[in-house]
Amino acid sequence: MTEQRLISELEQLVSEGRNPNTMHIDLLPTFDILREINYEDQTVPTAVEKVIPAIAAAVNQIVAAFQKGGRLIYMGAGTSGRLGVLDASECPPTFSVPSDMVIGLIAGGPEALQNSIEGAEDDPEQGRQALQDIKLTSTDVVVGIAVSGRTPYVIGGLNYAKSIGAVTIALSCNPNSIIAGIADLAISPVVGPEILTGSTRLKSGTAQKLILNMLTTASMIRIGKSYQNLMVDVHASNKKLVARAIRIVMQATGCTQADARRVLDQTGNDVKLAILMEITGMGIEEARAALQNAGGFLRKAISAKTA
């Protein structure tokens, strides 16, 4: 692509426009700069709210994939890629899922998490290769993340994913983007120009983070990873999380701290199992079988025993 064509394409993007509200931000004192940033940030949740129907459709596809043993794969470059990796990395400790159930891929590989890798996003072949390296299958869901909606790395990945029958989802912050035209589903929150022209780590990045939170959280709830609003599948891997596990058992059952600690010791800190045992009086093997029969849904297992 020629330089002139690239400039022309960027000029058409909402996310690359100049924000008329911040033309004189370089003249402002610190407090007023921060107030301008905060004012602009307040537009982000509204933009996300407008695309909830698209987010819901995406969640339904992700849930269907999980139920068939499929995976959720995020892919992006720069800030978009980092946000995908961040969200993916939070799923194992929060929901006790395997580390390869939600995967984050970033153009340039792991080094790009901390350092800019020159030209990494410009090659669609790298996007295809990244998905081949993780042995993408038709049961997986690929979410291509690109504020501009035109990142070659993401385009290459989405085209490959679609060619093998995987569900494809585009997340961009520009209407009618290239990746939206490729993917099966498009999520396109339009947050408008940034306070610093083209610095899409700001409002656009915030919108992406909110939506990625929604995709994984709602999907995990739908497959039984919560009871009420409690993280009953939390992986208690450090002192803080062990303390949280104790609190969750206490909150779910009304038991004492000592009783919560006792039943967690019996289950090896399996919170969901501990709650079921404490509420129903089941032994550990009976509770484990009941959870399996309920498909991992704690509420169903409790209802089946107490009905």
Curated annotation (Swiss-Prot):
Gene3D superfamilies: 1.10.8.1080, Glucose-6-phosphate isomerase like protein, domain 1. The keyword Lyase applies. It is an enzyme of class 4 (lyase). It catalyses: N-acetyl-D-muramate 6-phosphate + H2O = N-acetyl-D-glucosamine 6-phosphate + (R)-lactate. Its EC number is 4.2.1.126. Residues 62-225 form the SIS domain. SUPFAM superfamilies: SIS domain. Pathway: Amino-sugar metabolism; 1,6-anhydro-N-acetylmuramate degradation; Amino-sugar metabolism; N-acetylmuramate degradation; Cell wall biogenesis; peptidoglycan recycling. GO terms for biological process: 1,6-anhydro-N-acetyl-beta-muramic acid catabolic process; amino sugar catabolic process; N-acetylmuramic acid catabolic process; peptidoglycan turnover. The active site is at 90 (proton donor), 121. Keywords: Carbohydrate metabolism, Lyase. InterPro entries: Etherase_MurQ, Glucokinase_regulatory_CS, MURQ/GCKR, SIS_dom, SIS_dom_sf. GO terms for molecular function: carbohydrate derivative binding; carbon-oxygen lyase activity; ether hydrolase activity. It comes from the Bacteria. Homodimer. Belongs to the GCKR-like family. MurNAc-6-P etherase subfamily. Specifically catalyzes the cleavage of the D-lactyl ether substituent of MurNAc 6-phosphate, producing GlcNAc 6-phosphate and D-lactate. Together with AnmK, is also required for the utilization of anhydro-N-acetylmuramic acid (anhMurNAc) either imported from the medium or derived from its own cell wall murein, and thus plays a role in cell wall recycling. A lyase-type mechanism (elimination/hydration) is suggested for the cleavage of the lactyl ether bond of MurNAc 6-phosphate, with the formation of an alpha,beta-unsaturated aldehyde intermediate with (E)-stereochemistry, followed by the syn addition of water to give product. This is N-acetylmuramic acid 6-phosphate etherase. The lineage of its organism: Bacteria, Pseudomonadati, Pseudomonadota, Alphaproteobacteria, Hyphomicrobiales. The gene is murQ.
